[in-house]
Every structure is written in structure tokens, then in C-alpha cells.
A protein has these predicted regions:
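Glycine-rich adenosine-cofactor-binding loop
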Residues: 1-17
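Active-site flanking residues adjacent to catalytic metal/cofactor-binding acidic residues
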Residues: 3, 113, 137
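Flexible, glycine-rich phosphate/dinucleotide-binding loops
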Residues: 9, 31-32, 142
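Short, well-ordered alpha-helices that flank and scaffold nucleotide-derived cofactor binding pockets
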Residues: 14-18, 101-102, 156
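Residues at the starts of beta-strands that form the adenosine-phosphate
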Residues: 21-22
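Conserved acidic E/D residue at the C-terminus of a beta-strand in Rossmann-like folds
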Residues: 27
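Rossmann-like adenosine-cofactor binding region
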Residues: 30-126
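C-terminal helix-to-coil terminal segments
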Residues: 119-174
Length: 174
């Protein structure tokens, strides 16, 4: 399920579709997006509850609005199947973080997050210490030389990883 069918949601859907995943898009304007490439099905927010129990992956790519603020809460998360995943590349306030932590302790398989209700994420947040949570910076912009710097950092860290050396920029929980 991809919640948000703007340019980012559409790009994500095309990638998931290429991997033979059944992609359900959630949007405010179902009629406008009914034939959008990459989506097998398009539904509105009111119909979303029917699709949640069959959803293995929820990808948030929506704007923060009155409708999406706190959308991913305990009621939503409790309907997801055992072992499902949440990916948030939207806005932190779309997710109730306390409810997410509870769901991760009970039945979610994991979460991939680059946005949080309060940024930066508090150093004492339990999300930092959860082994099935991936946290990354929310970077939408690039600068001259960005790709080269990322490639060099990746290669350096790959070499370090393969030789058992510490990685650069790795966060270690205290």
C-alpha cells in the first residue's frame, strides 16, 4: 500500500510494480489516479480500512494535512498482519510514534524511517535501539558532487565492512 499518489508515490509504485508486487494506492482523488501507472488498485482514504489487513508493506509518501496527521495510529497498525513493515518517507507527524513503538514490540516486522514527529529524533527514543528499525536522514536535495561523495563513502564503508573495520558515520546506541 502506497499512501500518497504524487510524484514520489508514483515513482515508488513503478519500482514496486516492476518487482511484481501488488500495489494499492491511497489518494484523496481516486478518479484522477484510477489509471496511474504502477498501481494495481487505487482507493480513497475512506476505503483504506478494507485493504489494511492484506497489506504487507505500507509506504507513506503523502503530504501532512488534517487528513493525514496521525493517520498511522494504533487502530491502523493493529490491523496490519504479523510481520508487516512500515516505510515513512513523508512527514513524521503522519505516524503516532508511541503507537508505532508498541506495534513494533508486538507484531510489526520492522520500520524504515527518515522522518519523525520531533526532529531530530530524540536520543533516548526506543526506535534507536530496535534491531528491526532502520533510521536514515531525510535528504531530498543534492549538491554539486553529492553523487561522487556518496559513492566514495559507500566504497570506503564497504571495504571497512568486508575487512571487519568500523564504518564511517555509524551511529552506536549508548
Amino acid at each position: 500500500m502506497v499512501i500518497g499518489m504524487g510524484p514520489i508515490g508514483q515513482k515508488i509504485a513503478r519500482i514496486l510494480s516492476a518487482m511484481d508486487m501488488h500495489v494499492v494506492g491511497v489518494t484523496r482523488d481516486e478518479a484522477k489516479h484510477r489509471t496511474t501507472e504502477g498501481f494495481n488498485q487505487v482507493i480513497d482514504f475512506e476505503s483504506m480500512g478494507q485493504a489494511i489487513p492484506q497489506t504487507q508493506y505500507v509506504v507513506l509518501a503523502c503530504p501532512l494535512t488534517c487528513q493525514t496527521h496521525g493517520l498511522i495510529n494504533g487502530a491502523f497498525l493493529s490491523q496490519l498482519p504479523q510481520g508487516s513493515f512500515l516505510i515513512n518517507v513523508a512527514r513524521g507527524q503522519v505516524v503516532n510514534q508511541n503507537d508505532l513503538v508498541e506495534a513494533l514490540h508486538s507484531h510489526l516486522g520492522g520500520a524504515f524511517l527518515d522522518v519523525f514527529a520531533t526532529e531530530p529524533l530524540e536520543s533516548d527514543s526506543p526506535l534507536w535501539r530496535m534491531p528491526h528499525v532502520m533510521i536514515s536522514p531525510h535528504t531530498a536535495g543534492h549538491f554539486t558532487g553529492y553523487a561522487e561523495k556518496v559513492a566514495l563513502l559507500f566504497m570506503h564503508n564497504l571495504n571497512n565492512y568486508l575487512s571487519g573495520q568500523p564504518l564511517l558515520n555509524e551511529w552506536q546506541p549508548s
